[in-house]
From Swiss-Prot:
The chain crosses the membrane at residues 551-571, 834-854. Keywords: Membrane, Metal-binding, Transferase, Transmembrane, Transmembrane helix, Ubl conjugation pathway, Zinc, Zinc-finger. This is E3 ubiquitin-protein ligase RKP. The gene is RKP. Induction: Induced by the beet severe curly top virus (BSCTV) C4 protein and by BSCTV infection. Pfam families: RKP_N, SPRY, Ufd2P_core, zf-C3HC4_3. Disulfide bonds: none annotated. The keyword tRNA-binding does not apply.
């Protein structure tokens, strides 16, 4: 392993190997012995002791009698001390440094309290810091003016931190810190800049877990920074020389919430730099103690040394077993005596040489040498002082997990693995587990063990030096090379996650030694609750201080997901394997304690519920009588009989099917969205674990899990399958101690962890995967242009652009591959699918209970929806899309269609989330079929969609309508589109409109208003660009979006005229009149406002096909609207409908009408519709319509002129409507008695309930008596 910390103290990996002699061959029970060739006459016992302690030959005099610890101590104090006593004499000159020292004892380098500006909290003594103020700065108490010095900073967070050096003259304020003044120098990896009054680009971006080395060379007047031992180059040169007392101080500045750990030399550096000294002087006698550990290492019987090496050192043999006890006891006596002499030595050794000694004894890679390590622990733990050094060992192991770097050549035993493996073995010792649990920083260290260092662009370049993607021009060997790399990294991640699970299981099994006695799981439960409490608000834009690292939360999510999905196998005996069914895969009766929702626990106080805040809901829905209840139901009870797929049915859900996908092969098949058939190597467990397979074939899944404290394993033999699918019972289990770690509580924590930590990672993964596709397209387009261009200048620019695009693609490929490795392993996908099944059934069951449903936390719904879509879009795909919903998640369809307009959900963003899910799913044929086959969707969704079309949700509703109504418009004549139509929902939408006239009227009014607004906005945006004589990217993007929205709305309106033409042709003519005005309004803006060339320029973006932005996209629905109304008019009796042609002819803008329809006839429809006979026939109908319109307008022209003349020469009658000046004022508004025509009043009241004369609230509209008596044959009142 390449970690420097594993080599601190230079402990030799060579241990005394005692090979079997002839006597051992005869009796295998005897101890191993070292070969003996007695050429010198020296006895073997003395020679063996000399070898163990590294003494020269004959240094130990003849020994008579038995060797005991007192004799060995004498050897240590005499011969060994003489040989190594001068090791701790400082060889290097520590001139040029002074440490401000307060009190007695050796000087300790730390922060100078009076220098702190802002608010810095000590998270963990001595130097784990966090800024609580917006900007905090501080200096250390060490001043340097000569020599080469360094200190290290381990980043707990990766935000804005300025690390470096400053003099006393550097002022610290709430806005200025290190690097913001003369003689002040800093590096900030978040902004990738160095600071000395001004910022300049420098270095690499940093991530949480990085170790930054801050080095200053006052001999050459230079400052360097290192990231994980790699030099970032000289940051500053020619810095000013200063004298004693006026030198440079280590200094840091942190923004709010940023954390780091400073090491000035209190323990060995993780990445020491040759020639640079630590600011804190090393403790005395640390080298002597290190040599003692080296001696102990030689004492161990290890079979990994060669025979030749042993024979070259030893020429005689002696029994090691006889020497181990006295020698090891004497070494430990001396070792702990040294520790007592210097209080600083325990930390220096515990985080340095002693840790390296343990790691090398145990081995950093499998197979581990547990027996040798146990022998070491047995000896050291006999000494009461051992707790001093093991406390620092645990600290070092946790810190090592935070900062360990994955190295490809060391996979799979790389990164945090060696530290986790050693920690798991140590904590099997009860005394060490108790010591860890009793420490003040148990939870902080536990978080450290669950940490994993992140990777930035440069790290991924080292992890994946070779990159390949489908269609790349790279050598074919790159594909296999990247495949091997992904396999190696996947295995490494699996090893790390396995050790994290082992550690958590140890904590779960641990029983704290307290009174009254606690049950297993209480320690883990307390840690989990405190962690969630600390991370309240972690999902906010500005997270509060103290928030845990994302990697900790993600690791904990993986641990809990594995427990709930794959079971607690490591807690079970081999006889109980058949009972070990994961909680999420356990079929039959399900249950959930309502107390998780109805109790306002501290870690839930700030969590928003579906109905709002807990304090607000509790006033309307008291919870006193429900807190102790358990909700029970049968799996699948909320599904339709024909769609029900459960763990108990013959057809199994997707999470229990053997779809095995090779992660490396997904590189070849990106974008195909098909599951692979080969078995992957990215999981440490079988792709279809045995207990899941057993569960799928079992008939009952409510067996009690042996040795597992849980509230979810109680069976109710009397429940069975009853007509009442779910029931509520008193919570008898609640009388058991609350320290029990229940699986339902783990599920609750799992969803919250997903919401605050895992979901953001999936969003990043989605970004890189989608950006990769875009970058590949740009790269391919650039390659095409290079082949077609002949100009040298153009080729040069294109090649530069190509290099940039290629770098972008490679970066995206690496990030995408890393996310697939870390997030999309097979068992995680299986567990997440089962999680979605479980949660959606829970929500549907609780939805029947208003008093409980409103208390469900919002993150339940958000996590469910996000997890569902992550699995749906996963790459490689979890299962084929044709079975994704059908075999297990049909309940999800039921939930989204019944709750996207649920009044009990107070947060409109959540309703939008459900609505957007529908909008996305109906874009795919296989998912649309699932909607058509879902009873709740066909019964509830059509009317609910019409009602949801409002000022907030009109965009997703429009997209849904557009998908459902495909194939019913003029533009659908284009080949292929009609094959994706949904005749089922088209009929359901038509029926919903016919059966609810008020709903239809409201919907059409909103549709008219919205389309008018989008057309106006589009026209204004185009005009603004034309006036500025340039097309700005933002304005162009805005125009494209508004144009697309307008086209979509027009197509929805076209469908309305196709499916329910009588809404426009019968009844009042308000809808038809508004439709006519809107058509002319659109035609006017599309044909006269802007010239064609600028219009196309304002819409067309790079890489977008011309047919997607042509005028025909918006004009085609207008043709369809007119033709739909004409066809409906021909099928109805003339007296029962309004005159469409007459209404167009009566408009006051005949020129707009004529030129608009003439433009439609002459427009080139290529790309919008196909050129078949149906298309020609449709245009022929439009031409006939225009002919009739011209004739009607011509016949009405004399009458129009006469009417216009009369208006100019006579006064307007008192009874004429003063709004439209076209009709008679035949209605009165109550209570203000203002009069107008009934048509104007009703149209106004569609959007406003106040009088348009005096703004009084309208109570009633009273029509004149003779008007009320005028009715047509169907009983509809005629419009005046």
């Amino acid at each position: 392993m390449a970690e420097d910390s594993l080599r601190v103290g230079m402990i030799s990996s060579g241990l005394a190997v005692l090979l079997n002699g002839e006597d051992a061959k005869e009796n295998s029970s005897k101890a191993r012995i070292v070969p003996h060739f007695d050429y010198s006459g020296h006895r073997p016992l003395e020679r063996t002791i000399e070898f163990i302690f590294g003494l020269a030959e004959k240094s130990v005099g003849p020994l008579d009698g038995q060797v005991d610890s007192s004799l060995i101590r004498a050897v240590i104090k005499n011969q060994f001390s003489k040989l190594h006593g001068d090791l701790d004499v400082s060889v290097s000159q520590r001139e040029g440094i002074s440490v401000v020292h307060h009190g007695v004892g050796p000087p300790i380098v730390g922060l100078e309290e009076f220098s702190i500006c802002g608010d810095i909290r000590i998270v963990k003594p001595p130097l784990v810091l966090e800024s609580l103020a917006l900007f905090s700065s501080a200096r250390a108490n060490a001043c340097i003016w000569k020599g080469k010095w360094m200190y290290e900073v381990a980043l707990e967070t990766s935000g804005i931190q300025q690390l470096g050096w400053a003099t006393l003259a550097c002022p610290f304020t709430d806005q200025k810190g290190v690097g913001d003044a003369d003689d002040s120098y800093a590096f900030d990896g978040r902004r990738v800049s160095k600071w000395n009054k001004e910022a300049e680009p420098y270095g690499q971006s940093w991530v949480a877990g990085d170790v930054i080395g801050c080095c200053i060379d006052l001999n050459c007047d230079e400052i360097y920074f290192y990231r994980n031992g790699v030099s970032l180059g000289a940051a500053f040169t020619g810095i000013r020389k200063l004298g004693p007392g006026f030198g440079y101080y280590p200094a840091i500045s942190l923004s709010q919430g940023e954390r780091c750990e400073l090491n000035f030399g209190a323990y060995p550096f993780k990445y020491p730099v040759d020639g640079f000294q630590p600011l804190q002087e090393a403790p005395t006698r640390f080298s002597f103690a290190t040599e003692l550990l080296r001696c102990f290492s030689r004492l161990l019987d290890r079979p990994d040394r060669s025979l030749a090496d042993t024979l070259s050192r030893l020429r005689r043999f002696a029994s090691v077993e006889e020497l181990f006890c006295p020698v090891s006891s004497a070494i430990c006596d001396e070792f702990f005596y040294i520790l007592e002499q210097d209080p600083l030595l325990a930390e220096y050794l515990g985080r340095g040489a002693f840790l390296s000694f343990l790691l090398e004894t145990f081995r950093t890679q499998a197979p581990h040498d547990s027996s040798s390590l146990d022998k070491v622990l047995d000896v050291f733990l006999e000494f009461p002082q051992s707790h001093l050094i093991f406390e620092h060992v645990v600290n070092a192991l946790a810190c090592g997990c935070k900062t360990a770097t994955l190295i490809l050549t060391e996979c799979p035993y790389s990164g945090p693995y060696p530290y986790l493996a050693l920690a798991c073995h140590l904590f099997k010792r009860e005394e060490l587990m108790v010591q860890w649990w009793r420490s003040l920083h148990f939870e902080f260290l536990f978080e450290g063990f669950l940490s994993c260092r992140s990777s930035n662009k440069h790290d991924l370049q080292h992890l994946m030096p070779v990159v390949w993607w489908p269609g790349s021009s790279e050598d074919i060997s790159y594909e296999s090379s990247m495949g091997f790399t992904i396999s190696a990294l996947s295995e490494a991640i699996n090893k790390i996650e396995e050790k994290q699970r082992n550690l958590c299981l140890l904590v779960i099994q641990f029983i704290p030694p307290v009174s009254p006695p606690q049950l297993p799981g209480s320690a883990f439960r307390g840690f989990l609750q405190n962690l969630l409490l600390k991370n309240r608000g972690a999902d906010r834009t500005l997270a509060p201080s103290g928030v845990t690292r994302n990697s900790v939360l993600v690791s904990l999510f993986s641990v809990i997901l594995h427990f709930l999905s794959e079971g607690f196998a490591m807690l079970k005996s081999s006889e109980a394997v058949h009972h070990n069914v994961g909680f999420l895969h356990r079929g039959g009766q399900q249950k959930f304690p309502l107390s998780l929702f109805l109790k306002n626990d501290p870690h839930r106080a700030d969590i928003t519920r579906l109905g709002g805040l807990f304090s607000h809901i509790s006033k309307s829905y008291p919870t006193d009588d429900q807190e102790e209840e358990i909700m029970r139901w049968e799996e699948g009870c909320m599904d339709d009989e024909q769609n029900r797929v459960t763990h108990a049915t013959e057809q199994k859900p997707c999470c229990c099917l053997a779809y095995d996908t090779d992660l490396t092969k997904s590189l070849k098949d990106r974008g195909k969205n098909t599951a692979q058939s080969s078995r992957g190597r990215c999981s440490s467990i079988p792709e279809r674990s045995s207990h899941v397979a057993a569960e799928c074939s079992a008939g009952s899944f409510s067996e009690e899990i042996d040795d597992k404290p849980s509230t979810s394993n109680q069976s109710d033999p009397d429940f069975g399958y009853r007509p009442v699918r779910f029931m509520r019972t008193a919570l008898q289990e609640s009388r058991i101690s609350s320290a029990i770690l229940s699986e339902e509580e783990l599920l609750d924590a799992l969803l919250l962890l997903y919401h605050i930590a895992v979901a953001p990672n999936f969003k990043q993964a989605s970004y890189y995967m989608s950006h990769q596709s875009q970058s590949i397209s740009l790269l391919e387009e650039t390659d095409k242009q290079i082949r077609e261009r002949a100009s040298c200048d153009q080729i040069k620019r294109l090649k530069e652009a190509r290099n940039n695009y290629k770098e972008d693609v490679m970066d995206c490929v690496r990030h995408s591959a890393w996310f697939r490795i870390s997030l999309f392993s097979r068992w995680k996908q299986r567990g997440m699918y089962a999680l979605c099944m479980w949660v959606v059934q829970l929500l549907l069951v609780l939805s029947k209970m208003d008093s409980v449903f409103v208390y469900i936390p919002e993150f339940y719904l958000e996590s469910l929806v996000d997890c569902f879509h992550v699995l749906r879009k996963s790459d490689p795909p979890f299962v084929p899309s044709t079975t994704f919903i059908k075999q297990g998640l049909s309940s999800f369809i039921t939930f989204v269609v019944t709750h996207f307009n649920d009044s009990r959900i107070s947060n409109t963003d959540l309703k939008d989330l459900l609505l957007q899910s529908i909008s996305v799913l109906v874009q795919y044929k296989e998912y649309l079929e699932a909607f058509e086959n879902n009873e709740a969707a066909t019964r509830h969704m059509p009317a609910a969609l019409l009602a949801a079309f409002d000022n907030r949700s009109w965009i997703p509703v429009t997209n849904i309508f557009l998908r459902l109504c495909k194939g019913s418009g003029f533009s659908s004549l284009k080949n292929g589109e009609s094959s994706f139509s949904s005749t089922v929902f088209q009929a359901l939408l038509r029926d919903a409109c016919i059966n609810d006239g008020e709903l239809l009227s409201t919907f059409l009014n909103r549709l008219f208003n919205t389309l008018s607004w989008t057309i106006t906005e589009f026209s204004v945006s185009v005009r603004e660009m034309q006036e500025k004589y340039q097309v700005m990217e933002f304005q162009q993007r805005k125009c494209c979006v508004i144009f697309e929205l307008s086209s979509n709305l027009a197509r929805v309106l076209e469908f309305c005229t196709y499916a329910m033409p009588q809404a426009f042709l019968a009844g009042t003519d308000t809808n038809l009149r508004r439709l006519t005005e809107l058509i002319l309004f659109i035609l006017n803006h599309m044909t006269s406002a802007v010239d064609d060339e600028f219009f196309d320029l304002s819409l067309r973006r790079q890489g977008q096909p011309s047919e997607k932005v042509s005028r025909g996209i918006l004009l085609a629905p207008l043709v369809g609207i007119i033709l739909n109304l004409l066809e409906a008019s021909e099928d109805s009796k003339p007296k029962q409908q309004h005159d469409v042609i007459g209404l167009f002819a009566s408009m006051d803008c005949p020129d707009t009408v004529y030129y608009g329809f003439q433009y439609l006839l002459e427009y080139n429809w290529d790309g919008c519709v196909s050129g078949d006979d149906a298309y020609v026939k449709k245009l022929g109908q439009l031409e006939n319509f225009l002919s009739h319109l011209i004739n009607r307008a011509s016949s009405q022209e004399p009458e129009r002129k006469e009417e216009s003349f009369n208006k100019d020469t006579t006064d307007i009658e008192d009874n004429t409507c003063c709004i439209c000046y076209a009709g008679e004022a035949n209605a009165m508004i109550a209570p203000c008695s203002h009069r107008s025509c009934y048509g104007c009043i009703t149209r106004h009241l569609l959007n406003c309930q106040r009088c348009f004369f005096c703004n009084a609230t309208v109570i009633d509209v009273i029509r004149d008596k003779e008007e009320e008596e005028e009715e047509d044959d169907d009983g509809h009142k005629r419009s005046t």
